[in-house]
Amino acid sequence: MDSSSISRWFEYESGHAWCESAYKYQTLPYVAEFANTCTNLPIIVLPLVNIMLLRRYLHDVNGGLVFPQLLLTFNGLASTYYHATLNLFGQLVDELSLVWIITVFLVVYIPVMKWFPERFSKRLTVVRWVVLIVTAVVSALCFLEPNLNAIALMLFSIPAAVVIRYEGKQSGIPDIENFPSRILALWGVAFSFWFADRLLCDFWLYLGTPYLHALFHLLAGLAGYTIFIMFSMIDIESRSKTHRYTAAVRYFPDKNGSIFSFPYISLKERSQ
């Protein structure tokens, strides 16, 4: 690969531009899509909040839970870079990090998932390595043919939605019994904004509001964070015989848990 081919990946605006790019560089001269860049902040911060709240559990019981959550933070950083520059490298890293979030999430949480056949539990290490190797091969192919990444995301995301619904309903944890519906509702609205931004851009420009992709970031970030809350609760409950912690879901700022409130885990030690 010659230097011109490499430089193409890092050229400004070599990647896909969103509707907000019609106003590019108007807010800041070095940021292409200002709203799409700034709305990645929750995606960066919220996983770190969950890590902080669960730090004792992560240290004492299952430190592996930190990896998919750090990957979500990395995705927020990658998306920030992508929307600030609109270059092809940023776009691919942004999209590939989503594939790796799903992969590492599966590798970390699969021992406590009820859908995973018990007869394969003795071969868990082999299953994990197969998942990682397949994802690595797909990632390499995406650099050769970037359009493959959209296919990979579709292939990963559809069964992921099925697993989320199944695991939430089968968990037996009252605090998260409504989480599958909550997550899928957020994702549904988020993706409707994603498609509307791409397909109806001229209409939003006519209204002067080309910011639906920014709203997609906010809702998708909240949905992703809620997924980690749900599966963290499942992990804590599934391993309850091996540790001294109890956990409950709380909400901020609306304590009643409205759809746009932020769930978080209150972790306490059992009284002796």
Swiss-Prot record:
Which keywords label this protein? Glycoprotein, Hydrolase, Lipid metabolism, Membrane, Metal-binding, Transmembrane, Transmembrane helix, Zinc
What subcellular locations does the record give? Membrane
Membrane topology designation:
Multi-pass membrane protein
Pfam families from the UniProt entry: Ceramidase (PF05875)
Cofactor dependence: Zn(2+)
The Gene Ontology terms for molecular function here are: metal ion binding; N-acylsphingosine amidohydrolase activity
Gene Ontology biological process terms, A to Z: ceramide catabolic process
Q: What Enzyme Commission number does this protein have?
A: 3.5.1.23
Catalytic activity field: an N-acylsphing-4-enine + H2O = sphing-4-enine + a fatty acid
Query: Does this UniProt record's set of keywords contain Protease?
Result: no
- InterPro entries attached here? ACER
Main location class: membrane
Residues annotated as transmembrane: 34-54, 61-81, 96-116, 124-144, 148-168, 183-203, 214-234
Q: Which GO terms describe its cellular component?
A: membrane
Q: Name the positions where Zn(2+) binds.
A: 83, 213, 217
Q: Glycosylation positions?
A: 256
Keyword presence, Iron: no
**Biological function:** Hydrolyzes the sphingolipid ceramide into sphingosine and free fatty acid.
In which family does this protein belong, per the annotation? Belongs to the alkaline ceramidase family.
PANTHER family referenced in this protein's UniProt entry, alphabetically: ALKALINE CERAMIDASE
Q: What is this protein called?
A: Alkaline ceramidase
Recorded source organism is Caenorhabditis briggsae
